[in-house]
Amino acid sequence: GLVSDWELFDNMDGRSRALTMIESVEAIIKFWDDKDTYNYKGEFLDISLTKNVLSELGIGKFIKPFQKPYPEIAVSLKNPNSMTAKLAGEKGWIPISGNFVNAQDIATHWPTYKEAAQEIGKNPSYDKWRVGRSVLITSSDNEAKEILDDPMGVFTNYFLYLNSVSKLASGTAGNDINLQNEIPDAMKKAKDLIIVGSEQTVTEKLIHFIDTVGPFGTLLLTGHDVGEKKQLWKNSFSTMSNKIQPILNDYIKQKF
């Protein structure tokens, strides 16, 4: 959640938030399994629902998934050597590396996940790993440069938001954040982390990205505010799916 959520629920401690998340998942799974009553008591959560139940009207009953035992659980990863990646490996959850994370940090996610899984006798395939990235294929590299150089552009605004949220969360800035002063850093982040350019350039950048982070099963393309460039984005997704994806699939199979 956002730092504003942390304050709202009086939970500013990162460790307790992480453990509460784990307990929340455990409680949900338990409720999916339980037939009639719902009880869960952990270090951070104490949940009970036994009295105010009227099954005929669906009151006090949780909807249970059709998929058994339950749908796969996925978690997002950000930090290098992420403890969440370790937890996901132990639990068999789907790891998803964030699109706003640099490639060097992402490169630590799968090894951390795999090592944790192997410690309990599992041998996961990298096909399970999903990696997020912001990708835009333009008609030319010059068009890509114009988009990245726009101080009010979609990618600048995206990282302006993320950078500001991160500063609030770190506690180093308080509420004193001058958004105008944050624009240069947001533009730099966009240029560092967004994969944008002509079809050939994007293909080359994605291959370099794979060389850095290692093989993965799914590339998740991040959605952005398309604004007046709806057709550009539609063309980009189409080119990515029909032309570039097969190249990347072949590259991973041949190299790894």
Segment roles from a protein language model:
Residues 1-256:
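Active-site-adjacent structural elements that line small-molecule/cofactor binding pockets in enzymes
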